[in-house]
């Protein structure tokens, strides 16, 4: 896989080729857990702003259901799976991005493992907004309703061995021992990534990064 700088330039070039209009453009970046979505999204945001294009950012992680709700539903061990997100709230926010100039968005605090409401802002000058998340292109259920919202669809797909290494390291960095870190990666995160690849609507992807 190319380095993040090369990937950023590739996506930036696609953005520059998009038809000009006064309407806000929604750029969707999807991929499996630990695929590099967040890093790529932040780099593209910076690149756009360097060129004078104000850009907002909406991470789908801000729509994780609260742990208390997941416990009640018996889903805490599956956190990160499609059914553990507030999909109705997420779809509502995506629709608001096209209808409203300014709004706040929730952000996920990984260290505290919780969502912080209204922690992010989309401003009127943000003519480009990047949305990044696991299930943006899932060809299943309500997720399909999102496909027509995207002006540019980007999917990042590193090799499985790289995903595994990154996921284990992520859990180690969050304080788990090696056994627990491997279990979290193998039992939940990697299956979620395989689900994404098996149910993705490839026909709507404009840029596929490997």
Residue ranges: model-predicted function:
Residues 34:
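Walker A (P-loop) phosphate-binding loop of P-loop NTPases
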Residues 37:
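Conserved lysine of the Walker
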Residues 40:
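Hydrophobic positions on the alpha1 helix immediately C-terminal to the Walker A/P-loop
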Residues 51-68:
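Short beta-strand-centered segment that lines the nucleotide-binding/catalytic pocket of NTP-utilizing
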Residues 56, 68-112:
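Conserved nucleotide-sensing/catalytic segment adjacent to the nucleotide-binding pocket
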Residues 116-118, 141-144, 169-210:
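Small-molecule kinase domains that catalyze NTP-dependent phosphoryl transfer to phosphate-bearing small molecules
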């Amino acid at each position: 896989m190319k380095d993040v700088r090369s990937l950023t330039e590739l996506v930036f070039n696609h953005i520059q080729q998009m038809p000009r209009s006064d309407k806000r453009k929604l750029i969707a970046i999807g991929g499996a857990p630990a695929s590099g979505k967040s890093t790529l999204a932040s780099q593209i945001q910076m690149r756009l702003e360097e060129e004078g294009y104000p850009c907002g950012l909406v991470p789908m992680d801000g729509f994780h259901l609260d742990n208390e709700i997941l416990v009640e539903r018996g889903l805490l061990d599956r956190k990160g799976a499609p059914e553990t997100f507030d999909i109705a709230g997420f779809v509502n926010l995506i629709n608001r991005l096209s209808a409203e100039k300014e709004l706040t968005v929730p952000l996920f605090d990984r260290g505290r493992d919780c969502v912080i409401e209204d922690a992010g802002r989309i401003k009127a000058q943000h003519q480009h907004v990047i949305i990044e998340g696991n299930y943006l292109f899932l060809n299943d259920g309500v997720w399909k309703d999102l496909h027509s919202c995207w002006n540019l669809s980007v999917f990042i797909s590193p090799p499985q061995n790289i995903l595994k290494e990154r996921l284990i390291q992520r859990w180690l960095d969050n304080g788990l021992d090696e056994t627990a870190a491997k279990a979290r990666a193998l039992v939940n995160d990697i299956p979620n990534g395989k689900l994404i690849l098996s149910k993705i609507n490839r026909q709507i992807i404009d840029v596929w990064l490997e």
